[in-house]
Design a protein with these regions (language model features):
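Sec-dependent N-terminal signal peptides
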Residues: 4-13
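Positively charged, low-complexity terminal tracts
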Residues: 17-143
């Protein structure tokens, strides 16, 4: 009788060891801009799916460090970001590329004679220059 009780107690635990939890693997593909205001392009591999994310520090919060992540379900969605940046590069001041989850606005700083972009996600906001956009465009095209 003791053997049956022991078997019924051990078998469920032995069976659960066959089911391993596989956590998503995240790797940085490109560091667009380093600290203190980082922007990183990441690849997230979860079982059979590969998705991408743009991680950036929210510039609306100055009292602390808040990192926001803009997810892209697949490479095609990431290419839409590249197409939007390419179109805005050829555009004018105030042009906006609007998507379901985010928008990119082109702004120009007249004194510095440079082009800036404002990326607004679901909860965060970051700015980046044309040189950083070019780095992001060329890397996405190479994927």
């Amino acid at each position: 009788m003791k053997k049956f009780i022991l078997i019924f107690l051990i078998i469920p635990f032995a069976g659960f060891t066959a089911f391993k939890l596989i956590y998503p693997s995240t790797s940085n593909l490109l560091e667009v801009r380093p600290d203190p205001w980082p922007i990183n392009l990441q690849r997230v591999i979860d079982r059979r799916d590969t998705s991408y994310a743009l991680e950036f520090r929210d510039q609306q919060v100055l009292s602390g460090v808040v990192l926001d992540t803009l997810p892209f379900a697949n490479l095609q969605q990431l290419r839409y970001l590249e197409q939007g940046l390419t179109a805005l590069k050829k555009g004018h001041n105030g042009d906006i590329a609007t998507y379901d989850d985010y928008s990119i606005k082109r702004t120009e700083v007249i004194k510095k004679d440079s082009i800036w972009y404002m990326l607004r996600g679901a909860g965060g906001l970051t700015n980046f220059q044309q040189s950083e956009a070019d780095k992001l465009i060329s890397f996405i095209r190479s994927l």
